[in-house]
Amino acid sequence: MKLTPVEQEKLLIFAAGELAKQRKARGVLLNYPEAAAYITCFIMEGARDGKGVAELMEAGRHVLTEKDVMEGVPEMLDSIQVEATFPDGVKLVTVHQPISAEVKS
C-alpha cells in the first residue's frame, strides 16, 4: 500500500489518537502529545462525519478537561490547528484553549 506523506501523517495522528483514547478510558492522565492527538483525531473524524468548522471549533474545547491531562498540559496547549478533510474540501480548524477547566458531566 502506497501512502502519500499527508496520508501517512493522518494515519499516524489517528493511531496516536486511538492510543490516547484507550489510555483515557483506563483512567491514565494524558501527556501533551497524547492530548494533542486526542483532540486532533476528534476534529478530523468530526469533519469526515460532516460536522461544520464552527461546530468543531466549539466542540473541540470540551473534549478534554484539566482532570483528563497531566499537570501543566493545559498551559502548553493554548490552541490546536488541524487541516481537516470535510465533504467539500480541506479546511483549517483552530481550537483556542482546547482543554477546559470545567468538569464533564
From Swiss-Prot:
<dbReference type="InterPro" id="IPR002026">
    <property type="entry name" value="Urease_gamma/gamma-beta_su"/>
</dbReference>
<protein>
    <recommendedName>
        <fullName>Urease subunit gamma</fullName>
        <ecNumber>3.5.1.5</ecNumber>
    </recommendedName>
</protein>
<dbReference type="GO" id="GO:0016151">
    <property type="term" value="F:nickel cation binding"/>
</dbReference>
<comment type="pathway">
    <text>Nitrogen metabolism; urea degradation; CO(2) and NH(3) from urea (urease route): step 1/1.</text>
</comment>
<dbReference type="InterPro" id="IPR050069">
    <property type="entry name" value="Urease_subunit"/>
</dbReference>
<dbReference type="GO" id="GO:0005737">
    <property type="term" value="C:cytoplasm"/>
</dbReference>
<comment type="subunit">
    <text>Heterotrimer of UreA (gamma), UreB (beta) and UreC (alpha) subunits. Three heterotrimers associate to form the active enzyme.</text>
</comment>
<dbReference type="GO" id="GO:0043419">
    <property type="term" value="P:urea catabolic process"/>
</dbReference>
<comment type="similarity">
    <text>Belongs to the urease gamma subunit family.</text>
</comment>
<dbReference type="InterPro" id="IPR036463">
    <property type="entry name" value="Urease_gamma_sf"/>
</dbReference>
<dbReference type="GO" id="GO:0009039">
    <property type="term" value="F:urease activity"/>
</dbReference>
<dbReference type="InterPro" id="IPR012010">
    <property type="entry name" value="Urease_gamma"/>
</dbReference>
<keyword id="KW-0963">Cytoplasm</keyword>
<keyword id="KW-0378">Hydrolase</keyword>
<dbReference type="Pfam" id="PF00547">
    <property type="entry name" value="Urease_gamma"/>
</dbReference>
